Amino acid sequence: MEEAGKLQCIIDSNIYQQMKCGGCKNVIALHGSIYENTCPHCGKIYSMEYMRDSEKIPRCESCGTVIRPGVKLFGEMMNSTIMSEASSQVEQADVLLLLGTSVASEVYSKYLNHFEGRYLILIHKERQFLDERADLLILEEPRKVLEKLKF
C-alpha cells in the first residue's frame, strides 16, 4: 500500500517493529521498540540481542549503568513528540484504517478525536464496542483482507 501511494503512515502500538521489519518506511512506534535500548547515563545504544544474551541485568559496557529498554513501561509517560506526530498524521488522513484493534482501544481512541477525514474503516475478527462509528466494518482477520486486496 505504501509503494502504491495509498498509505502515508502507520501508527503502531507494537514494540516488535513488525511493520518496519516488513519494509514499511513511515512507522510511528507509540510504545517504542525492543530493538533500541539505551544507557540513560552515557547514551550508548544496545541491540535487542545484547539485552537478550545478558546473563544478568544488562549493564552498559562503558559506565556500568543499567541499560534502559527502548519501550514505554506501564505507568510511564508517553513521548509527547511521538504523540503529537501521531495526532498530526491522523488529522491529515483522508481515510483511517484500523487493523486488529478497536475504536474503544485506550491507545487509539484519543487519536480518533483528531480524525476529520472521509472514511473510518475497521478490520478485525469479531464485533466490538463502538464498531458502529466506522463507515466500513470488515469482520475478518486483517492479514487475510489485505492479501485479498493485494496489499
List PLM regions with ranges:
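Conserved catalytic alpha/beta core of Sir2/sirtuin-type deacylases, generalized to analogous enzyme cores
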Residues: 1-151
